[in-house]
């Protein structure tokens, strides 16, 4: 009830609501826009929201972009006792930027995917790859849509392999993972 009265007070402060009347009719849309504080626009919105990638992959991407995946560095921050080293390379501490494209396995997977899509460039760091995928997601060209979708599916595929290594000590070769990613992209076009 307090929230309703608070919103009423805000409307009264705005001039009694007369600014929301057009041609003698109260426009709820105008009042809503006035009362509703719009959130900050994020640059990755089109990458996640307009993706043709599978819903599971898109959700994992959404978590990864916001650095909300349960990587070992985050588990340690939550006071969960885990070994901080990466489950795939067993050399460096696992965080989002390490997991995605800072070690050999993920780099090989992403390189193979890029080569099969006809993209001739080296693998970049996590934030640079996200920026590249965001740029591709803004385009309507089929090749760019495929690249953005492949990026999302690659993040998901690498995440699955990381989980498979941790929970069942099994990891597929980068070629198998890359081919599965490309198959998913081809099926969803």
Tell me what each language-model feature is.
Residues 1-189:
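A helix-boundary/hinge signal
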